[in-house]
Swiss-Prot record:
Name under which the protein is recorded: Pestheic acid cluster transcriptional regulator 3
Region (Disordered): 71-123
GO molecular function: DNA-binding transcription factor activity, RNA polymerase II-specific; transcription cis-regulatory region binding; zinc ion binding
Chief location of this protein within or outside the cell: nucleus
Entry keyword set: DNA-binding, Metal-binding, Nucleus, Transcription, Transcription regulation, Zinc
UniProt cross-references to Pfam families, sorted A to Z: Fungal_trans_2, Zn_clus
SMART domains (UniProt xref): GAL4 (SM00066)
Length: 564
């Protein structure tokens, strides 16, 4: 039987380089061997324009190929006196930078999230099965990107994150980065993207193209590893076996950020749903099959405080709580824009309890009690849209829930006011409460947002006079107390409150805030869509007397906003 006829064109990379291509899937062997991006066999890439962009990519590929061919130094350090580990190193070393030409591309049988840079194997000289650690050298290019991620990118993603000293700072993140191949490459892709945005005007066209290729290579590796990890996770879940899910779910969350920042339409929603699925599975299983120490599982199940529990337990508990809180927060934010019920709503009462060890105020700035109520408002909004709740048929139930939510918010704000007085007293005594004050300001802005959002869900844009005092209070706080550096933390309040702003000075204030340099950071390119949506809402409110909140939710661009 004759072989099927193959295209003579090959992948787009080989066509550009005018090289023979074996058309391997998902990438050809030639590109794999040289560790260059294989642009596949689909539609013609945008950069292939017979112009400068194509020339830049070609020059970049030539540069990488030349560099690859010269690189012969060993990639691994072996402790003195120990033989080199015969086990093939995890593939992370091959894709982390530009590898040597003799790099193996064998299919791995171990889970891709296992042992990123820390590789252990039983030594034949150890009859007791002792484990020996082989630490790989992080290439210079990767170390620059890795530190840029830790120092610059992660703080931009989580500007309110202030880890407690008992949590070991951001040590859990560094450990996870070096242990999880997919997360490592997700971080490097995001870091490469951010650095390229920052220095775009200061580097040559060739350097820009090289950075773009580097970014795509890391992103491609991350996506492949996440797909493999999800398959393994699904298999082990069905087999009721333990699995390493924390590295994978952290990788997926970083993909959400990357796709959002890079303006890749609504691709982020697919990965957010995947992260939610993993978190939900862990909670339903009560962590039984998550690859954590028993001590960590006990602390998490009983919602205990961290004490001096050892580095491993501290790392595992901190990672799970941080990522769990992040996923719940992102789930709520996406529900606000999509008009849907938060998928993790059933966990809010426990995870977001005031006494819970998961503190959203340390992750995104708003206190648990209020985010719990915002989740309820999102659910009420979702029921109206998805389940057809109407004032005529479900009026009593709808307004009863709304009244209870409003009462909870007002009670909470009264408590916050008392705490604010205590903060002012402490400040007068010379006590530094800058982080506490930031949380208080953030929570108050989210509280104003919640009251206004609740009104829009139940009354649309009618009876806005009932909100004048709330709007005025929010504007006073924004003008007098909220520093410019906090604007990125309150994008959601700025949007929701801005929706009901009056023409003139009020709308100008929200326009200026969302268009400010701190808001329109180069990493957050999607924020221009937030401001654009707000401008459209103001225009529609002005020209239509029957404009509703459902009309806002049905706006094409609004569905895919994530208020970060």
């Amino acid at each position: 039987m004759s072989n099927p006829v193959r295209s003579k064109g090959g992948c787009w990379t080989c066509r550009l380089r005018r090289k023979k291509c074996d058309e391997g899937k998902p990438e050809c062997t030639t590109c794999q061997a040289l560790s260059i991006t294989c642009y596949g066999y689909g539609p013609k890439p945008e950069w292939m324009d017979n112009g400068d962009a194509e020339k830049d990519v070609a020059n970049s590929l030539k540069h990488i190929v030349r560099y690859t061919s010269r690189r012969t130094s060993s990639r691994y350090r072996v402790p003195p006196g120990q033989k080199a580990n015969p086990k093939l190193a995890p593939k992370v070393h091959a894709a982390a930078s530009t590898p040597s030409t003799n790099t193996s591309h064998s299919t791995e049988t171990t889970p891709p999230s296992d042992n990123g840079f820390y590789d252990t194997a039983e030594s034949p000289l150890s009859p007791n099965g002792a484990q020996h650690l082989t630490i790989a050298t992080i290439p210079a290019e990767d170390s620059i990107l890795l530190m840029h991620f830790l120092d610059k990118v992660f703080p931009l993603q989580y500007p309110m994150y202030r880890p407690d000293i008992l949590e070991g700072g951001r040590g859990w993140l560094l450990a996870l980065l070096l242990q999880t191949k997919s997360l490592y490459h997700a971080a490097l892709a995001l870091s490469s993207y951010h650095r390229r945005m920052l220095v775009f005007e200061r580097i040559s066209e060739q350097c820009r193209a090289t950075a773009a290729v580097q970014q795509e290579k890391h992103l491609e590796t991350c996506l492949n590893e996440v797909r493999q990890a999800m398959v393994i996770l699904d298999q082990r879940t069905r087999q009721r076996k333990s699995y390493d899910g924390m590295g994978t779910v952290t990788s997926i969350v970083q993909l959400v950020f990357f796709e959002l920042f890079a303006g890749q339409d609504h691709a982020w929603r697919t990965h957010l749903n995947a992260a939610i699925d993993v978190y939900d599975q862990n909670c339903r299983d009560k962590l039984e099959h998550l690859d954590l120490s028993e001590a960590s599982k006990t602390i998490l199940r009983n919602d205990q405080r961290l004490a001096v529990d050892g580095a491993l337990v501290t790392q595992e508990v901190t990672t799970f709580r941080f990522m769990g809180g992040s996923i719940i927060w992102l789930d709520i934010l996406s529900s606000l824009a999509a008009g849907s019920v938060p998928r993790l709503l059933s966990y809010h009462q426990g995870v977001l309890d005031a006494a819970s060890q998961v503190k959203l105020e340390n992750i995104m700035g708003c206190k648990n009690w209020l985010m719990c109520q915002i989740g309820r408002i999102a659910a009420l909004q979702g029921h109206r849209r998805q389940d057809g709740w109407t004032s005529q048929r479900h009026g009593i139930k709808l307004h009863s829930i709304a009244a209870d939510i409003k009462s909870e918010i007002e009670s909470g704000m009264a408590r916050e006011a008392l705490e604010s007085l205590n903060i002012q007293t402490s400040d007068s005594c010379g006590i530094n409460n800058s982080s506490t004050n930031s949380v208080t300001l953030t929570t108050r802005m989210f509280a104003f947002m919640a009251i206004i959002h609740l009104h829009l869900v139940t009354h649309d844009f009618e009876r806005l006079d009932n909100l004048r005092e709330t709007i005025a209070d929010a504007i006073r706080l924004l003008q007098s107390q909220v520093p410019c550096s906090m604007i990125p933390v309150i994008v959601a309040p700025l949007f929701i409150i801005g929706c009901v702003a009056a023409q003139g000075d009020e709308q100008s204030l929200f326009r200026a805030s969302l268009a400010s340099d701190t808001s329109q950071h180069r990493l957050y390119r999607h924020r221009k869509d937030v401001l654009s949506a707000l401008e459209e809402i103001w225009s529609k409110r002005q020209t239509s007397t029957d404009y509703t909140w459902n009309d806002v939710l049905d706006m094409g661009q609004h569905k895919y906003l994530l208020f970060l």
